[in-house]
Amino acid sequence: MMLASERHQLILSMVREHGAVRLTELVERLGVTAVTVRRDVTELADRGLLTRVHGGVTLSRARGGHPEPGRAASVFGPAAPGALVGMVAPSVEYYWPTVIQGAQSTVAAAGGRMVLRASSYDAAQDRRQITKLLERGVQTLLAAPATTGRGALDLLRWLGTLSVPVVLVERLPPPELPTLALDAATTAHALGAGLAVRHLVSLGHRGVGLVTSRSSPHSPAVRAGWRETVASLDLDAGAALDLDVPVYGSHGWAAEYDALLDRCRRAGVRALLVHADWEAIGLIERARDGGIAVPGELAVVSYDDEVASASDPPLTAVCPQKHRLGAVAAELALARLADTTERPVHRLQLWPTLVVRESCGSTAETGPA
């Protein structure tokens, strides 16, 4: 199986040779699914290396498929060229690296430079890192700040007073700050949860439970989408278990996961949506060690698709469009910086997709319907 970087090089080589290539040709040449090709093409287009056209791709306007600095633009308006963009991310390990890459590629395509600082889901640390970037002289900020907990509201109010444009990434102001005028790029996590539930129902399940990580800021949105879909489809209320678990590998995790599986067995739950990947992998591990067949006796859909394909069996997963999310956030920031007139607040939400593998007993790939 080719690595993503190898596929990208082959795609660029084919486009440089022929000038334009149809997506169906790429699927045949690469030996992967259309979904995978579309992801690869989107990433290359976000980096300014290709231009998407109906049914295919061509070289970008930059010669030879290399990014042309200073000429980037988006549906949000012209992009400020040569900008120094700051970004504060809550992690540089799970989920966020792809978001960061998407933002960095977009800034580079506009001839700018991105400066990154990592935080730790803590409002005080967020503020320290943002202050350092402001002292560095950044002209605009991408931030994924804490929105709950001690100091979060004060942090968000402070962000709203800064003289440089701020774009929230995977964050929205809480209900306490309904008029905070900050642009934002987010994922429709509630919709993603609904995709997972509807997929399990399409396979014959009439009861779908939910398992969420206690540490994830996305769990409330995933839970809201799960609840809404379970109610709208009139699924078995007795099987609609709403459970949370500690982080996979943390102290005492195995005993808690075993207890959860026992509760599912007693309630007759045979399908679960699990947020996030590591928790889903841990749950499958404990299930199989306990003699529960996956997917034969328990179907599992994971949420995040960071390491889901490495599970045994590979996990069907809801996949947020992380690279595109970072790119869109950067586009918003650069457009805001370039527009000297009064422009309205932009809040953009991207739909995730569903990647179907083996953990539910189906092997086709699909997207939102």
Segments the model singles out, each with a brief description of its role:
Residues 194-234, 346-359:
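An alpha-beta-alpha
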Residues 146-194, 278, 304-315:
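Flexible loop/hinge segments that line or gate small-molecule binding clefts
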